[in-house]
Design a protein with these regions (language model features):
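Long, non-globular segments of proteins
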Residues: 1-215
């Protein structure tokens, strides 16, 4: 394995002892660490709506059992892309490669979940995602926030390779909830957002991407 893969938490566990676990979802069978070909291993992951990453077959998914190593998380999500490998594309729509290692990902919602806001080096805030701190962050764009009417969740632009849009964690969305203005009535998505002394008109540009993603 390349160094990045050899040092991953899963790879370390594989070397320490057998962790091959058979998973059988309806119509789906896989084994963590399976070898579909010489020199190739496959692992399967799940991302919840709080931005926590787990091995897909972890029975109890909570803060204790999620991955927390920033180096691993950063590498995993920096290399995340649509799964066009020809394997598990419907069940695991995203894939993070590390050399010949394939890391398949399915999500509760989207493969990017913004979890905290950080100060940026130029004074402009950053929005960090999936536990990566400043290593996984994009510039915060208040005017691009969007509430998706079908589920009431809040979204923000994300890296293009991961679909271009990410979910804002519910706790962070709740912190910002008082800043939204509903200029077209409470039954419609908000039209403006108050941030650091400025009203931002919400463009709604992400709504089309979200509808296509969830159709």
């Amino acid at each position: 394995w390349p160094r990045c893969c050899r040092g991953s938490p899963v790879a370390v566990a594989m070397r320490a002892g057998p962790v091959l676990r058979l998973c059988a979802h309806p119509g789906l069978r896989y084994r963590q660490g399976q070898r579909p070909g010489p020199g190739t291993r496959e692992y399967f992951y799940y991302l919840d709506h709080q931005g926590q990453l787990f091995l897909d077959d972890t029975k109890v998914k909570n803060f204790i059992t999620c991955f927390k190593d920033v180096g691993f998380l950063s590498f995993f999500f920096e290399h995340l892309q649509r799964n066009r490998s020809g394997r598990y594309e419907a069940e695991f729509p995203f894939l993070s490669r590390c050399g010949r290692e394939r890391n398949f990902l399915r999500c509760d919602d989207l493969p990017v979940v913004f979890t905290q806001i950080l100060p940026g080096p130029d004074g402009n805030p950053l929005l960090s995602y999936c536990g990566g701190g400043a290593r996984l962050a994009v510039p915060f764009q208040p005017g691009m926030l969007a509430v998706f009417p079908e589920n009431g969740r809040l979204y923000h632009p994300a890296p293009r390779r991961a679909g271009g849009v990410g979910l804002v964690r519910s706790a962070l969305a709740a912190e910002w909830s008082s800043g939204f203005q509903f200029g077209e009535g409470s039954e419609r998505p908000p039209t403006h957002f108050w941030w650091e002394g400025t009203w931002y008109r919400l463009s709604g540009e992400l709504l089309g991407i979200l509808r296509a993603e969830k159709s």
